[in-house]
Amino acid sequence: MASSRAKQRNRSIQPIERKYQLTRRILEKLLNNNVKTIILTKSNLVTRDIDIMLENSRNLQVGLTIITLDEHFKRAFEPYSPSVKERLSALEKLSRNGIVTFCFIGPMLPVVTDESLWTLIDVLENIGVKMLIFDRMNVKWGLNKHLLEIIGKNFPDLYELYEKVFTGGEYWKYYKSLKNDILNFCEGKSFKVVFCY
């Protein structure tokens, strides 16, 4: 079990941010000086600063990262971050207030992302998100080992599939196929689609 110090270190927004509001003060300075600002976070705390955003929203885009609609999967990969429901609510609140919003969907993972991806895309369109950015799992030395450990511990029935995709040469085939499926599904939708791969 992780120590409380480790848990705090892994939170999207540190407890100190709530007290000192450093991000809020930086955001205010950027927007007051007409600096184009893009915020990407996993935290619904971003809505705390909506009053500042509304003063100069023309130079601002705000995005939240979501890897899946499934809270069980989310807890395994992002145990200390806000729930998917809280993130979607934040995106909706920002969009409803005229802030340009986007969603970073990544890293996309077999089954974890796939099973709820199409529903997630529809939900994001309905709440007014203007752009979806998709990214693959960047397999680096040691990272796929860590990923396989998480899968083995939490989803042993998926271990063989993940081993095949991330160590057995199916990596690019999987992501190329998924990219084509996403492009087909998103054709005619009201948002821009961007891929990081």
Positions of predicted regions on the chain:
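Conserved AdoMet/S-adenosylmethionine-binding subsite of the radical SAM
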Residues: 1-174
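A cross-taxonomic marker for long C-terminal extensions/tails that follow the last structured domain
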Residues: 161-197
